[in-house]
């Protein structure tokens, strides 16, 4: 179930301030954030935002097709290394 349209999209204030400050600065730096719940706005396009995945900050370059999605969607928290190999030959 999605968010109500009357509420509008959510973005943390501290993240929005960092993006606006970056817009005024001539050099682009990576913006670190722990806010996986924030929605990607059109003003974020072209910036690299490092999203925390519980262990490290994953750099995410914001592109046009990412607008409307959440930052956490692009920084997976779980690492899947596959199921154990089938060892039927070694059991005989």
From Swiss-Prot:
Protein's UniProt keywords contain Ribonucleoprotein: yes
Role description: Protein S19 forms a complex with S13 that binds strongly to the 16S ribosomal RNA.
One Pfam short name: Ribosomal_S19
Signal peptide: none
Organism expressing this protein natively: Streptococcus uberis (strain ATCC BAA-854 / 0140J)
Bilayer-crossing regions: none
Family listed: Belongs to the universal ribosomal protein uS19 family.
PROSITE patterns documented for this protein: RIBOSOMAL_S19
Entry's Gene Ontology BP terms: ribosomal small subunit assembly; translation
Protein name (database record): Small ribosomal subunit protein uS19
UniProt key word Ribonucleoprotein: yes
One annotated Gene Ontology cellular component of this protein: cytoplasm
Gene designation: rpsS
Keywords, ordered alphabetically: Ribonucleoprotein, Ribosomal protein, RNA-binding, rRNA-binding
Classification via HAMAP family: Ribosomal_uS19 (MF_00531)
GO molecular function, one term: structural constituent of ribosome
